[in-house]
Amino acid sequence: MISTPLDDLDRAILKLLKKDARLTIAEISNQLKKPESTVHFRIKKLQERGVIEKYTIILGEPIRPRELALVVLEVDKPIIEDFLDRYMEYVTKTLSGFPEVLFVAKSGKEKIVALVGGEDRDKLLKFIEENIESIPTLRSVQVLPISEIKKGDEISGFLAEV
């Protein structure tokens, strides 16, 4: 999973910061019953090693998309193989330009996976139909509406644009 070894203290610090990045060194130190100097040093080292890249926010429910869908796009294989790479790049950039598209990834040579969010189910499906399914030379578009999130509910709040 990760190539940088972490000990129990590093993991405990990361767990607390992941839950609330606003915690002060003193608060972390009190919760872990470790000296502030130790916690400060460890956080600094985690940043230097790239384990902590940045501190950010997760948007709350009032501003998150209410409906989500995974969209799997399969691109038609062109006669000239080089065109497939260019077209995949075009489609991923096009998708990335929409604020409703929260996440875009290539899967293999011909598939793209996107997480799309919307205010309600009708608007979400309309957006997908008008803006994604209309992209030329797609072999197929599979829309998988998400009915219930079992783990990672905050991801849409992290990915959503303001």
Curated annotation (Swiss-Prot):
Record-linked InterPro entries: ArsR-like_HTH, AsnC-type_HTH_dom, HTH-Siroheme_Decarb, PF0864-like_C, Tscrpt_reg_AsnC-like, WH-like_DNA-bd_sf, WH_DNA-bd_sf
Domain HTH asnC-type: 6-99
Superkingdom per UniProt: Archaea
Keyword Transcription regulation belongs to the record: yes
Molecular-function GO terms, alphabetical: sequence-specific DNA binding
Record-annotated DNA-binding residue ranges: 25-44
Alphabetically ordered keywords of this record: DNA-binding, Transcription, Transcription regulation
Pfam families attached to this UniProt entry: AsnC_trans_reg_3, HTH_24
SMART domains in alphabetical order: HTH_ASNC
Name of the protein in its database record: Uncharacterized HTH-type transcriptional regulator PH1013
Species for this entry: Pyrococcus horikoshii (strain ATCC 700860 / DSM 12428 / JCM 9974 / NBRC 100139 / OT-3)
Lineage, broadest ranks: Archaea, Methanobacteriati, Methanobacteriota, Thermococci, Thermococcales
